[in-house]
């Protein structure tokens, strides 16, 4: 199968190539696409070199599938053009996520919503994906009423420039800044732009996407998202109120049996999820599982995942695998 990766030279695009290879996705020919400044560069995939081309030429090459990770403006302009040419697009930007005509998919939760007619499929926000993968089995059993999430997010979510800024600051080297402030030895309580309601766009992504993925507009969600000087993955402190009471042992059992979830929760041995351990893993790690002592039917969780993998590239490839396995691609 011919597969295009739009944004192939970025952090997520590079990870998409890695994940496609690792999971043995049937790529007969890779079509790497990037911006003007990357045209003519070569990327290596499965031992072969491929030249980076522009989006127009990629459409002419007639791939069956295009994985997009080149930002919202690129997706808004080019995804419909790819789709019009009969190419299935899985888009990692926020461009199509809340479009009522587009599916927002986390395969462990709502892959059954997909159909052969879906030409543009949205990949959710990284911080949303890991949270809903962990919470969905609990929602099925106890019905979530309210979620309060605080995130501790990796600089890799911003991109190459942010990683470079962090590494430069650690070495005491001056360079281009991805953030308005230093990130090393710091925590920046702003991810994306502030909106009129006082929340950031990232925070509202978590609010709105959670409801759409879990197909339940009654769930109340509030979030505070924070960038921290970490590279391995995103961490989240999540407080969840349910309609029904629960037993902690049953919660652990449900999470242990959930697809894509690994429970790491042994406080006595100082065992809990950390971004360093989640790095280059596809699972969502859950720990610090405990009842909220201040409110009935309420649980605290600590959720960690590699935002470039399950939070982006792996989730997109899993969507493609589902389409392929069900004769939709």
Residue ranges and their predicted role:
Residues 1-183, 218-220, 284-285, 289-295, ...:
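N-terminal Rossmann-like NAD(P) cofactor-binding subdomain of oxidoreductases
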Residues 66, 155-329:
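Charged docking surfaces used in two-component/phosphorelay signaling
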């Amino acid at each position: 199968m011919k597969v295009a990766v739009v944004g192939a030279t970025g952090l997520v695009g590079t990870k998409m190539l890695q994940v496609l290879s690792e999971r043995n996705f049937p790529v007969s020919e890779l079509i790497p696409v990037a911006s003007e400044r990357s045209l003519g560069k070569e990327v290596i995939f499965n031992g072969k070199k491929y030249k980076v081309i522009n989006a127009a030429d990629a459409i002419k090459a007639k791939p069956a599938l295009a994985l997009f990770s080149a930002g919202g403006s690129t997706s808004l302009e080019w995804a419909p053009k790819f789709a019009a040419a009969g190419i299935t697009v899985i888009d990692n930007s926020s461009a199509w996520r809340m479009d009522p005509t587009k599916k927002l998919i986390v395969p462990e939760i709502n892959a059954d919503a997909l159909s052969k007619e879906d030409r543009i499929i949205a990949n959710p926000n990284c911080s949303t994906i890991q949270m809903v993968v962990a919470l969905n089995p609990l929602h099925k059993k106890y019905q979530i009423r309210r979620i309060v999430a605080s995130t501790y997010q990796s600089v890799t979510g911003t991109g190459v420039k942010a990683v470079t800024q962090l590494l430069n600051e650690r070495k005491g080297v001056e360079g281009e800044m991805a953030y308005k402030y230093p990130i090393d030895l710091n925590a920046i309580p702003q991810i994306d732009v502030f909106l009129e309601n006082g929340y950031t766009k990232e925070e509202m992504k978590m609010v709105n996407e959670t409801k759409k993925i879990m197909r339940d507009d009654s769930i109340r969600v509030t979030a505070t998202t924070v960038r921290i000087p970490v590279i391995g993955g995103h961490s989240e402190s999540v407080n969840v109120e349910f309609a029904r009471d629960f037993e902690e042992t049953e919660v652990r059992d449900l999470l242990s049996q959930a697809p894509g979830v690994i429970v790491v929760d042994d406080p006595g041995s100082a065992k809990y999820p950390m971004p360093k351990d989640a790095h280059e893993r596809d699972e969502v790690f859950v720990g610090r599982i405990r009842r909220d002592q201040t409110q009935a039917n309420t649980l605290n969780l600590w959720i960690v995942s590699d935002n470039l993998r399950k939070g982006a590239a792996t989730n997109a490839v899993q969507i493609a695998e589902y389409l392929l396995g069900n004769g939709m691609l």
